[in-house]
């Protein structure tokens, strides 16, 4: 297993709603957040990497859409996830 796989399985285990849960909005948002944090660090040293920046913006947009979906579906789960991940809003 690579480092990314180990980190991914840790995130899934931490945010899963059940034993085999990998697709719930909470897990998807947590995985996107981990990737966003990783890419943000990359841009501190590679400021002109515009190709990756476009990918980062897509991830941020996708995370925002998933959070909006979760907020409309179950506001309590939304608030708990925002607090647990330390996101604004």
Swiss-Prot record:
GO cellular component: cytosolic small ribosomal subunit
One protein family per Pfam: Ribosomal_S15
InterPro entries: Ribosomal_uS15, Ribosomal_uS15_bac-type, uS15_NS1_RNA-bd_sf
Family, similarity comment: Belongs to the universal ribosomal protein uS15 family.
SMART domains registered for this protein in UniProt: Ribosomal_S15 (SM01387)
Record keywords, A-Z: Ribonucleoprotein, Ribosomal protein, RNA-binding, rRNA-binding
Keyword ATP-binding among record annotations: no
Name of this chain's protein: Small ribosomal subunit protein uS15
GO molecular function: rRNA binding; structural constituent of ribosome
Known partners and oligomeric status: Part of the 30S ribosomal subunit. Forms a bridge to the 50S subunit in the 70S ribosome, contacting the 23S rRNA.
Primary role: One of the primary rRNA binding proteins, it binds directly to 16S rRNA where it helps nucleate assembly of the platform of the 30S subunit by binding and bridging several RNA helices of the 16S rRNA.
Any one Gene Ontology BP term: translation
Domain of life: Bacteria
Lineage: Bacteria, Pseudomonadati, Pseudomonadota, Betaproteobacteria, Burkholderiales
């Amino acid at each position: 297993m690579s480092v990314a796989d180990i980190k991914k399985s840790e995130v899934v285990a931490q945010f899963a709603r059940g034993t085999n849960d990998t697709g719930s909005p909470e897990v998807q948002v947590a995985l996107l957040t981990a990737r966003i944090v990783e890419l943000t660090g990359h841009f501190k040293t590679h400021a002109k990497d515009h190709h990756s920046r476009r990918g980062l913006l897509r991830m941020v947009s996708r995370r925002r859409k998933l959070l909006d979906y979760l907020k409309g579906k179950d506001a309590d789960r939304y608030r708990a996830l925002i607090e647990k991940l330390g996101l604004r809003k």
